């Protein structure tokens, strides 16, 4: 009964222009009689791989190229829409720079706005779990050198990021030539620090509401000061120490209210000397943090100096920048199983450094990983074809950190790794639930309707 309609839809799709990239002005998505949900003329919507208060993250497929993509869906009537702003920032950043995902399309999808992005690999938080929640110095330095460059590029486009956390930095898909590159994603909380009209730096202000992730945000952000370039770099420094130490001194603090908890995190951060935070690690880690914390609000950071701190330490240790991260040789979690990263295929060896084994972290890692990943568990390594899927959860997970957002800056994302078929309804937002420390304070409950719905 549906064959004529399906054939008509296929003919319509094949008569369109460029196969890969659809512009903002392309026709709205359609749902064929078969129940297939489309975003624009090219992209078929698949199962849900993440959700949060922004809407949902779905797996998608480009019907022209047969490539998998990630599709972010946000209700058009969202209380604090951010998807179009994020799309605008991606366009402002451009697609030529290394370590930024390709953006293929933005447009309506029924009652939702949709943004189609390149599907990347797992986040640094996923990989941190995989490596028993500690990274070696070599891996952290290779990450740090790349992320200083990513942040320099973002800042060069007159944007500050304001959302540093391991979940927002992803490696490329395994088997892809960019699988070793650390990507930066999710610009929903970004802000222009250069006024587009006056071309001047935004003014210094105080009494600002918190924006970002409390675990990593700068001390000045806790104090209510307007963020600038210095704050992105300080947050990176906190994340680097998180990777080296396995945790930060201000994690796990108890308080009666969220406001009190944020206050305690900020107080502990201020009262922890850099020397104590970086104790038992190379002095260069402390040098980095001291420098970024002393920057003036308007000051342009010396990115070359910061990179040099870490590159010289890297060379002093005798490391080779071969991208032999700690996760190389381990099975990488994907939506359909796992992919074993074979270091032999890329001539990368792990002999240049020894992974620090911390058995005491194992039970904690297993529990935390199972709580957060759900069905995204690592299965025994097996052969897969070149079209295997990798996780794209970094924009939608919190990794145990308390997350805060200004009401004027959009909404935050959290992962619900429950798979869904392409004809499953995209559920609306429900109530906010405050959960324990291991979760996010902005977690949104989802109730799936029993009866299937179609977008008209």
UniProtKB/Swiss-Prot annotation:
Active site: 163 (proton acceptor)
Record's keyword annotation contains rRNA processing: no
Compositional bias annotation for Low complexity: 17-35
InterPro entries: Casein_kinase-1_gamma_C, CK1_Ser-Thr_kinase, Kinase-like_dom_sf, Prot_kinase_dom, Protein_kinase_ATP_BS, Ser/Thr_kinase_AS
EC class: transferase
Protein kinase domain mapped to chain residues: 43-314
Cell compartments where the protein resides: Cytoplasm
GO cellular component: cytoplasm; nucleus; plasma membrane
Enzyme Commission code(s) on record: 2.7.11.1
SUPFAM superfamilies in alphabetical order: Protein kinase-like (PK-like)
Function: Casein kinases are operationally defined by their preferential utilization of acidic proteins such as caseins as substrates. It can phosphorylate a large number of proteins. Participates in Wnt signaling.
Descriptive protein name: Casein kinase I isoform gamma-1
Organism encoding this protein: Gallus gallus (Chicken)
């Amino acid at each position: 009964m549906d064959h004529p309609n399906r054939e008509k839809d296929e003919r319509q799709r094949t008569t369109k222009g460029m196969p890969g990239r659809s512009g903002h002005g392309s026709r709205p998505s359609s749902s064929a009689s078969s129940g297939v949900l489309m975003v624009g003329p090219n992209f078929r919507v698949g199962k849900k791989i993440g959700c949060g208060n922004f809407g949902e993250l779905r797996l998608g497929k480009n019907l022209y190229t047969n490539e998998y993509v990630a599709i972010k869906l946000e209700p058009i009537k969202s209380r604090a829409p951010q998807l179009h702003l994020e799309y605008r920032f991606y366009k402002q950043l451009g697609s030529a720079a290394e370590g930024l995902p390709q953006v293929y399309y933005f447009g309506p999808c029924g009652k939702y706005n949709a943004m189609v992005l390149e599907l990347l690999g797992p986040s640094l938080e996923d990989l941190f779990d995989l490596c028993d929640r500690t990274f070696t110095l070599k891996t952290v330095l290779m990450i740090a050198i790349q992320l200083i460059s990513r942040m320099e590029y973002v800042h060069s486009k007159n944007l500050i990021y304001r959302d540093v956390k391991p979940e927002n930095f992803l490696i490329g898909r395994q088997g892809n030539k960019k699988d070793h590159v650390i990507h930066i994603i999710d610009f929903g909380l970004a802000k222009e620090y250069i006024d587009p009209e006056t071309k001047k730096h935004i003014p210094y202000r105080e009494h600002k509401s918190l924006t970002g992730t409390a675990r990593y945000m700068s001390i000045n952000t806790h104090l209510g000061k307007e963020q600038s370039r210095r704050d992105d770099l300080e947050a990176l420094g906190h994340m680097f120490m998180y990777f080296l130490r396995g945790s930060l001194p201000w994690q796990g603090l108890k308080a009666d209210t969220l406001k009190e908890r944020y206050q305690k995190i900020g107080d502990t951060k201020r009262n922890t000397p850099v020397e104590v935070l970086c104790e038992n690690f190379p002095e260069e880690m402390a040098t980095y943090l001291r420098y970024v914390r002393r920057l003036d609000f308007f000051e342009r950071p010396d990115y070359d100096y910061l990179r040099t701190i870490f590159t010289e330490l890297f060379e002093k240790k005798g490391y080779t920048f071969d991208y032999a991260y700690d996760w190389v040789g381990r099975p990488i979690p994907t939506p359909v199983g796992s992919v074993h990263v074979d270091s032999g295929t890329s001539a990368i060896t792990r002999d240049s450094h020894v992974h620090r084994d911390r058995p005491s972290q194992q039970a904690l890692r297993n529990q935390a990983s199972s709580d957060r990943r759900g069905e995204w568990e690592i299965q025994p390594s097996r052969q897969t074809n070149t079209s295997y899927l990798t996780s794209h959860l970094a924009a939608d997970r919190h990794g145990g950190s308390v997350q805060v957002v200004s009401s004027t800056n959009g909404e935050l994302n959290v992962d619900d790794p429950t798979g869904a078929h392409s004809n499953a309804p995209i559920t609306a937002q429900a109530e906010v639930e405050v959960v324990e420390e291991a979760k996010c304070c902005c977690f949104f409950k989802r109730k799936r309707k029993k009866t299937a719905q179609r977008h008209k």
